[in-house]
Amino acid sequence: MKPTMFVCGKQSVEKTELIRTVIHTFPSSPLYNTSGNELFETPVVDFVEANSSDTNKIPVPDEAHAIWFCIDGGASMFSQEEADSIKSLDERALVVVTKSESLNEDQIKSLMDILLGFVSRDQIVLVSVDKKSGLPCLVNRTKKIIGNSLKNLSSSFFPSRFDREWDRFFSRRLQLWSQKNEEEANSYITWAAGRAAAIAIVPLPLADVTPLVANEIYMIYRLAGVYGIANDQSLISMIIGCTGGSLVGKLGSSFLPFLKIPIAAAVTYGVGKAAKAFFESGMELNGDTLLEIFEKAKDEASGLFW
C-alpha cells in the first residue's frame, strides 16, 4: 500500500511550491471530487494538495497517513481559523511554517509561544523553499509519521522495505539540501564568532557580556531556522547550559581586550558548533556529547586569528 500525504492550508502558504521542491513533480489529476484537490504522485508516497481557502472546511481524509498543515511565516500572524485548525490536529500532522527566511528573532519567539501551546515541538517544522532550509527535517519527520501510521493500520507492513524505498527516493535530495544547510549554518557561526570578537573590544569590565549573550542567542535562532527546528528560550538555555558556555564566567577574569577577544570568539564558535550538531541530529544528542563538541570547537577556534 502506497501511503498518502495530505497538504492543506491557505492559498498563500506556498503549498504547491513546497511539494514540488520536495518531490520534483507536478500534479497529475484530481484525486477527489472535492474542488481543487490535486494529486502529486511519486513511487513511495502520493501527495494530495487541498486548495480550499477556508481552513475550517478542509476535509482531511481518513486515509491520509500524514498531514502537512502549512501556515505562512511571511504573514504577521496566523488567523483564528488557522489556530482552531491547529488545535484539532492529531499525531499524523506537522505544522509547517513556510517562508521561514522572512522571520526575525522576535517573530519566531512570538510564533513559537503560540504554536508550542497547541502542538509538540516535534510537530513544528520551519521551512524555506528558496533557501532549502528545514527540508531534511520535514522529510525525516514525515517518514517517521507515515511509518507509524502504516504500522498501526496494517499487520503486513514491513518497515525495512518502506525505509529502503523512501531512502532511495529521497537520498539525493537530502544530500543536496543537507550540504546547503551546512554551508549556511557554518557561515552563521563564523559571522557570529567574528561579531563576538568585535564586541569584545569594549575595554570596560563586563560591559560587553550582554551584547555577547544576545549575539549567541541570535546565532542559535538562525541555526535552528536552518534546520527547521521550533526554537524557544527553553531550548536555547538548554544548549548554552549543556555547553558550559557562560561568557560571564569566561570573561570575568579577562578585562583586557586582547585577552577577551579570542575568548569571546572561541566560546561563541564552540556554542555554534554544538548547536549545529544538536539540530542536525534532530535534537537527539545528549549533554555530554554537546559539551564535548563545544570544547573541541572552542579549542580549534582559539588558534584562529580573530
Task: Name each region found by the language model.
Residues 1-50, 221, 227-230, 273-275, ...:
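Conserved G1/Walker A P-loop phosphate-binding module
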Residues 189-274:
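Membrane-inserting effector segments that mediate pore formation, membrane fusion
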Residues 55-123:
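Conserved C-terminal guanine-recognition region of P-loop GTPase G domains, centered on the G4
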